[in-house]
Amino acid sequence: MAKTVLGIHVTFLTLLFAVILLNDVMYTPVEKICERASGTWKGICIHSNDCNNQCVKWENAGSGSCHYQFPNYMCFCYFNC
């Protein structure tokens, strides 16, 4: 009888612990990414790797990429909002 009660308690505590862990993982907020034109890039953006390097090194952005915005391709940097 004592082993059965102990087993039920262990099972209950294990399930409770799993629910708490999964709840924390499932509701982790996702950071929003903000985009803005590079303030240091000059001219038409042709190579996204160059844009990315400049955004990361000079503007402390997470990344950068070339995108078309009228009238030409521009370098855009991406930051955590």
UniProtKB/Swiss-Prot annotation:
Family, per entry: Belongs to the DEFL family.
Organism encoding this protein: Stellaria media (Common chickweed)
InterPro entries membership: Defensin_plant, Scorpion_toxin-like, Scorpion_toxin-like_sf
Lineage: Eukaryota, Viridiplantae, Streptophyta, Embryophyta, Tracheophyta
One of the Pfam families matching this protein, by short name: Gamma-thionin
Gene Ontology biological process terms from the UniProt entry: defense response to fungus; killing of cells of another organism
Functional summary from the UniProt entry: Antimicrobial peptide probably active against fungi like B.sorokiniana, F.oxysporum, F.graminearum, F.avenaceum, B.cinerea, P.beta, P.infestans and P.debaryanum.
Full protein name: Antimicrobial peptide D2
Alphabetical UniProt keywords: Antimicrobial, Disulfide bond, Fungicide, Signal
